[in-house]
Amino acid sequence: MDKKASRIRRATRARRKIAELGATRLVVHRTPRHVYAQVIAANGSEVIAAASTVEKAIREQVKYTGNIEAAKAVGKAVAERALEKGVSTVAFDRSGFQYHGRVAALADSAREAGLKF
């Protein structure tokens, strides 16, 4: 089993548990160059809020899009957008990525901006 298959297996298991809870989830995806975050409704069919380093507004705030500072900017932006839509509590879905570095920075930034998880 390669690295990507292992990550997807971990992500599937976590998503199954979150679905059983029926919770709105904050999903994180990372690539070497970008970080993406979405708040997805409990039924899984609607994206309530989203932010990523691909967006021009966030790219202008940061020097490089693939580092911890960029992840913090994405976390703050997605939390603010979710709170505007009335979502304050979410389950954190790290998509099988290790809770470390950019993933942890995004989560901490979203918490500081007012999102509860």
From Swiss-Prot:
One of its GO terms (biological process) is translation. Pfam families: Ribosomal_L18p. This is Large ribosomal subunit protein uL18. This is one of the proteins that bind and probably mediate the attachment of the 5S RNA into the large ribosomal subunit, where it forms part of the central protuberance. Belongs to the universal ribosomal protein uL18 family. Part of the 50S ribosomal subunit; part of the 5S rRNA/L5/L18/L25 subcomplex. Contacts the 5S and 23S rRNAs. Signal peptide: none annotated. One of its GO terms (cellular component) is cytosolic large ribosomal subunit. GO terms for molecular function: 5S rRNA binding; structural constituent of ribosome. InterPro entries: Ribosomal_uL18_bac-type, Ribosomal_uL18_bac/euk. Keywords: Ribonucleoprotein, Ribosomal protein, RNA-binding, rRNA-binding.
